[in-house]
Amino acid sequence: MALDSAKKQEIVTKFGRGENDTGSSEVQIALLTKRISDLTEHLKVFKKDHASRLGLLKLVGQRRRLMRYFKRKDKDAYLKLVAELGIRDNI
């Protein structure tokens, strides 16, 4: 399920560097994390939805690549973001 614009704007203002900052790594990782958690909840109910499972795996891979890049560029901000989002630092 896609994020509605209000929820997306809330995430952008919380994690972005500016008001309309949608391209920074922090915002992209936060948006992907929200989409991943929504899809995970969906798959708990619909266990045989393999198309959504494939989409979930693609999102996780995309987030992993972004996190690897962000960790390499700004380690302190990366650790803060990981703690704030409540995700593991296994990259």
Curated annotation (Swiss-Prot):
GO terms of biological process kind: translation
Record Pfam families: Ribosomal_S15
Stored SUPFAM superfamilies: S15/NS1 RNA-binding domain
GO CC annotation terms, alphabetical: cytosolic small ribosomal subunit
GO molecular function: rRNA binding; structural constituent of ribosome
Keyword Kinase applies: no
Transmembrane residue ranges: none
PROSITE patterns found in the cross-reference section: RIBOSOMAL_S15
Subunit architecture: Part of the 30S ribosomal subunit. Forms a bridge to the 50S subunit in the 70S ribosome, contacting the 23S rRNA.
Full protein name: Small ribosomal subunit protein uS15
Taxonomic classification: Bacteria, Pseudomonadati, Campylobacterota, Epsilonproteobacteria, Campylobacterales
Name of the gene encoding the protein in the UniProt record: rpsO
